[in-house]
Amino acid sequence: MRTINKILDKIGKVQKGKSLLWQLYPLLFREDLYAIAYNRSSSELSLKSMKHRDSSDRYSLVIIKRLINRIRNQTTSKLLFQGSDRKNLKINRSLFEGLTVLFEMIIPVESRPLVQYQSEWNSLQSIHSIFLFMEDRFFYSNSILGLKIPYYFHPEMIIRLFRRRIKDVFLLHLVRLLFHNYQNPFVPETSLFYSLKDSQKRLSILLRNHYFYEFENQLVPLWKRFVQLQSLSHRFLMDQTNPLYKMKHGLGSLQPFLSEINLLETPCIHYVRYENHSIIAFKGTKSIVNKWIKYLVGFWQYNYHYWLQPCQIDIRRPSRRCFSFMGYILGFRSRMIKVHTKRIDESSTTHCIIKEFCASIPTSSLIESLTREGFCDSSGRPVGRSTWTILKDDDILNKYHQIWGDLSCYYSGSFSRDGLWRAKYILQLSCAKTLAQKHKSTTRVVRNHFGLKFITTLNSVKNPFFIGSQEYSHRKNFWCLDIIRMNSLVNLINMKKESLSSS
């Protein structure tokens, strides 16, 4: 217990340290530290709970001891001259294991990634909360800048970010050797990223989120200073309200003093980011937009040594053009509402035109993503998945049900759902044709054979607030607040838009 308490105190000091972290490299060789770090999420922090864990558990003490031995046997020459040797690649995976545990204690909580699979519902972790924020805030903005934060940056940039907190030279040299050897291990687009183990993927996500955290941690304070310095004064007439009361109580003498009062109205800057896609919305003229672009280009150049071109920043006017973000087409639309006013002797009706936030589905892009996945051809006609004919009938139905459930929940907040109904039609016929190919029959025979089971496959969604519910009208949008990651088909839509914008 004394050893555990000492290590727990060590972990506490490491997590509380804000500027200087000197002795981190020796922690890679403490097996008890690995055990407690991997078990810190549970309430039982003891060696007894670790020893009695299942032998198939990945983070048992036996595996941890083997991990320590591999790290101790690692040499610098193997790191420098390993090439593409698979044996050396397996040896270096142990270093990624240790660095992942260590960085999870060092990196601030704000930059740690959200858990992708949660057992409990938590609306604060939903990516749809971004759209709720945009509905509330973006209405007052007339200029939107779309910026893609680069993934491909030099590995030395991460080392410089760590040097602000870590003062252990040995650990920094070890991290530098690994990063330069693997070129860019924190870029998910590289083929090496998919060849890594889960711990290395977790390290890559952790480093990228820390990179975004440092970027935002420098940018937001500058914006706060900008808001405080660039205040605009407006005149406001106070003597025009309640004139009878003022005349009765002799407030007319104060009219020269109350006629002009300056009120400060600060410009609103709204910032939204998901992964490496960010949006900056504000209210300003064209000259202010150009100043913002120059500011962002200079910010990336002098702070991160990344030469951002002005053409890489997408400029949108929400009143004129729509913009795409996270698989949605976002914009504003005008809507007329009736306002009834009642008086003592009469009543009147007036019409008001208001603007509201509108999120729609990119139907053509959604159909093309379904085509790429093999559910329909290039013209949008449903086709069967021949690769799924080896599965059981229930497995085929469950696969289509899961795809439709994810799509319907993700696009639940869209204003017009015509694209969803078309996607549902494609998935239904694709499912029928897949079953028909398996049984060497026709779609009509398949429908008659499965009956109600086939009809209800794509009509029931696991979320209680699904699109076909009578509780919510088709004119109202409902954002499902239990979604913490994007749908795979939506990712294909984003990849296509990025390729078109880059070309």
UniProtKB/Swiss-Prot annotation:
Transmembrane regions: none
GO molecular function, one term: RNA binding
Pfam name, any one: Intron_maturas2
One Gene Ontology biological process: tRNA processing
Main location: plastid
Residues annotated as signal peptide: none
Record-level GO cellular component terms: chloroplast
InterPro entries membership: Domain_X, Maturase_MatK, Maturase_MatK_N
Keyword annotations of the record: Chloroplast, mRNA processing, Plastid, RNA-binding, tRNA processing
Subcellular location(s) of the protein: Plastid, Chloroplast
Function: Usually encoded in the trnK tRNA gene intron. Probably assists in splicing its own and other chloroplast group II introns.
UniProt cross-references to PANTHER family, sorted A to Z: MATURASE K
Family to which this protein belongs: Belongs to the intron maturase 2 family. MatK subfamily.
Protein name according to UniProt: Maturase K
